[in-house]
């Protein structure tokens, strides 16, 4: 996961995304990748909306597109009703959604998810799995999971 996202350089081989080599064109490739680590780096003192705006700026989402992309990401992840809540008040499942919404900003071609359901209760796992399944319509989804039941959401395992 760390090599595919550009966090770690490969000792051999290459990572190619849309015909571009990650080592030769890291910024261009990273713009096409959305990454959700197992423990998303969230700021508990921010509201959901503030965090999404912050993430959009970090991802260099053009200012004119920022509002639309933030609202769209919150809609996709079921966070519109939660946008004014502090992240620290959210359940683990909703905090995971906050990280996933931020991952979708910039409209990445590839979405890489590292253990997105770890620590969630059974209901939250089903909700996140359905959400991930819906992402397949617009993104290539790469998922790391130790839970084999997660395989039902994917075409290739």
Regions found by a protein language model. Give the residues of each.
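Conserved ABC ATPase "signature" region
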Residues: 53, 57, 64-82
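Catalytic Walker B motif of ABC-type/P-loop ATPase nucleotide-binding domains
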Residues: 111-115, 120
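Helical segment within the ABC ATPase nucleotide-binding domain
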Residues: 125-137
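Helix-to-loop junction immediately C-terminal to a conserved catalytic motif
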Residues: 5
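Conserved ABC transporter NBD signature motif
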Residues: 13-21, 28-33
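Conserved ABC ATPase signature
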Residues: 86-90
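Hydrophobic anchor residue at the start of the ABC signature
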Residues: 100
């Amino acid at each position: 996961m760390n090599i595919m996202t550009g966090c770690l350089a490969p000792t051999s081989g290459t990572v190619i995304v849309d015909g571009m080599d990650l080592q030769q064109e890291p910024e261009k490739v990273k713009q096409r990748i959305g990454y959700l680590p197992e423990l998303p780096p969230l700021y508990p003192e921010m509201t959901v909306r503030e965090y999404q705006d912050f993430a959009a700026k970090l991802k260099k989402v053009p200012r004119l597109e920022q509002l639309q992309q933030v609202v769209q990401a919150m809609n996709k992840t079921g966070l519109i009703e939660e946008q004014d809540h502090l992240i620290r008040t959210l359940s683990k499942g909703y905090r995971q959604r906050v990280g996933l919404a931020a991952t979708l900003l910039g409209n990445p071609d590839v979405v890489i998810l590292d253990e997105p359901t770890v620590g969630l209760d059974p209901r939250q796992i089903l909700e996140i799995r359905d959400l991930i399944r819906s992402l397949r319509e617009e993104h290539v989804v790469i998922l790391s999971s130790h839970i084999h039941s997660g395989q039902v959401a994917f075409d290739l395992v």
